[in-house]
């Protein structure tokens, strides 16, 4: 087995939870970073940006405050349906562990403010 997880449904766990708990508010976060980085962000040797996906702006702001309180930077990744992408990132992150290649494990982080300043900095691919 190469470690790639099969997708059972065409949705995300965040969206499934929201559909099952209709009165609840779901904010998808912390699944793109390992537990040991959450416990001690200084291990990352730089700012750790944590994406948040939710349909509720107020709930997302409350969770963003929690992210900031532990020394990380919240990043608004959009509505809850974007948790699909975040969950796939989590799967990619787990591949070395699922293949029993712990020595090849890695972390990845979002870096904001890196886009070109305008359309002049972008060219079409040929």
Model-derived regions, located:
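Rossmann-fold NAD(P)-binding glycine/threonine-rich loop
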Residues: 1-42, 59
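Active-site-lining helix/loop region of Rossmann-like oxidoreductase modules
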Residues: 48-126
């Amino acid at each position: 087995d190469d470690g790639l997880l099969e997708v059972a449904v065409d949705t995300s766990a965040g969206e499934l939870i929201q559909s099952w708990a209709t009165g609840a508010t779901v904010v998808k976060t912390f699944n793109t970073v390992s537990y040991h980085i959450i416990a001690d962000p200084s291990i990352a040797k730089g700012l750790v940006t944590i994406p948040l996906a939710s349909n509720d702006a107020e709930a997302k702001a409350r969770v963003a405050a929690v992210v900031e309180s532990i020394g990380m930077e919240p990043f608004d990744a959009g509505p809850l349906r974007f948790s699909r992408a975040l969950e796939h990132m989590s799967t990619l992150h787990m591949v070395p562990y699922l293949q029993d290649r712990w020595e090849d494990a890695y972390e990845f982080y979002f870096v904001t403010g890196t886009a070109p300043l305008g359309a002049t900095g972008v060219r079409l691919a040929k």
